[in-house]
């Protein structure tokens, strides 16, 4: 089998994770920490790309990686327009939306830009894979009870789909042939209903839907939320932080560290026990609801993400949902590996690269 060498790039706010893979085998994985003062010199996140590019190339050189031997570069997908899942070739339309922050400004927007900047000089393809804006929801799933307020698909698409593919392989099936309920449990929690390779419904783990998590409030009583918003006690930014960043475990028990909470549970702390059980309860309830989306025809329930390492949490969830389908636990996440696998599927011609196309304010994915 021929060897495809792939450089993968996952930019964070103050770091850039890079990896070099020979097919599925990691040759190099490194987290480049950026000096906060250095990063702070740039007014816009997008202005950091040249600095980050040079830093990446220096690190590769220091490890003896000859970039002329690369077959492709793959970056983390950023805040683009809603698109279906898959591996996309970085093109001019995508670069424009990433640079302009079409759906928001975030360090992940640098992923596609860095991939393109490095790949174009080598005359090799640049890709992104399954960004958080992946949207495969069916029309019926978009409707909310307020006109003009559609439900949106924002979730851990990269890890959910990567793990779903691994589970399908484990079950000796193709991802596109299975119905799976995949739950990513990390700083945020999302439960996706995967129908034959498409996530037809999923809770918006960023903007207040679904289970509460270590840092996010999830679904809350809306009437009380409105009262709080107009109480005069909080600014808008403070309310946003209550939902994302200072919600969930942070609000309820003053920590986002699930390991610490689990230790409290093991010591018999009644408050910690109730709150941790409530988080598991809400996850299980979300899984139960998602099972109805797939008419109860579920091949497996999958638990993944950092919290899937928690035996207490996993056992509590299993106890409530294992009657629906077998529960498969795939803890942790490996975004670098998932990016490499997405690029590899295209290089091996197992799937065609998709094209990011903007038409009349819409994005159309073409395979």
UniProtKB/Swiss-Prot annotation:
Pfam families: Acetate_kinase
InterPro entries hit by this protein: Aliphatic_acid_kin_short-chain, Aliphatic_acid_kinase_CS, ATPase_NBD, Butyrate_kin
Disulfide bond residue pairs: none
Molecular function terms from GO: acetate kinase activity; ATP binding; butyrate kinase activity
GO biological process, one term: acetate metabolic process
Keywords from the named record: ATP-binding, Cytoplasm, Kinase, Nucleotide-binding, Transferase
EC class: transferase
Catalytic activity: butanoate + ATP = butanoyl phosphate + ADP
PROSITE patterns per the UniProt record, alphabetical: ACETATE_KINASE_1, ACETATE_KINASE_2
NCBIfam families for this protein: butyr_kinase, PRK03011.1-5
The name this protein goes by in its record: Probable butyrate kinase
Naturally occurring in which organism (per UniProt): Bacillus cereus (strain B4264)
